[in-house]
Amino acid sequence: MTSLNNKPGLLPALSLGVLLACLAPLAGSRADDWPHWLGPKRDGASAEKGWLKKWPAAGPPRLWEQNIGGGYSSIIISGGRLILFHRIEDTLHIDSLDAATGKRQWRFSYPTDYEDLYGYDAGPRCAPAVYDGGVYTLGPKGVLHCLALDTGKKKWSIDIRARYKIAPNFFGTGATPLITGGKVFCNLGGI
């Protein structure tokens, strides 16, 4: 069963378009990486300068646009790449896009049959994280992947729900992996 929220459409394209419009004032400057949820210091603050105090009457210029699937993931920025985790129908996709052009550099995909117990969007529910040349994602069914940042090739994966016998819960798994000191930390379950 696939809900309408998991099909590509106007809202996801609009969401990415708004993000790109917000980044437009910074085009030509080297933006800081935003390698995981809440940014470089995990505090939601950006050190960038030169933000517009007010948008032009016609709105900010659109750099490019891309149709994307559903989910709750935020976009991660690393080395001029946008890393996006999204779902189209019954497939989860991790995409690397060139931040300047929107051109897809690679895509890693895998099937999912996860459905939210209460009919909300079926995910993914958390952002990717980039650390030391790897992209880490945790899907709503509890599959943790590590992909090579430059190619998107799978380095390894683990089904943490199966390995640790975690019962299904309200939201599935939905916490962005935390990578520090060469170790990956994941919230394995909860309410």
Tell where the protein language model's regions lie, with residue ranges.
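Bacterial N-terminal signal peptides that target proteins for export
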Residues: 2-16
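Bacterial N-terminal signal peptides
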Residues: 13-25
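Noncatalytic, solvent-exposed loop/strand surfaces
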Residues: 28-191
